[in-house]
């Protein structure tokens, strides 16, 4: 913990070690889902191949998720390195759908996003329809 005096204002900084994980299998995905449900929060952000969403070449590459400050995880989707990081048999569409059904469509989990309009377009493309509150 650090105290910083700037002019007449005193700021408190807490050094926080972050914990970030790449989800590699269904067991880890279930743990991520349990964390989101336990805290009641899921801050989600998609990364893509930067193609327009309605182009056939559009691909979501990663879904990053945080359930509390300092903790986060990436769900590998249609990324060129997905097979290097995930267990054999990883089906990113099924894993995305599972996360969507249990977290995004869960009324009791508050969704937090920076660009929800875009992220929700991706969700809808994969038949995930958010329920509850989104900030």
Locate each region found by the language model.
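Conserved RNase H-like, two-metal-ion catalytic cores of nucleic-acid enzymes
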Residues: 13-135
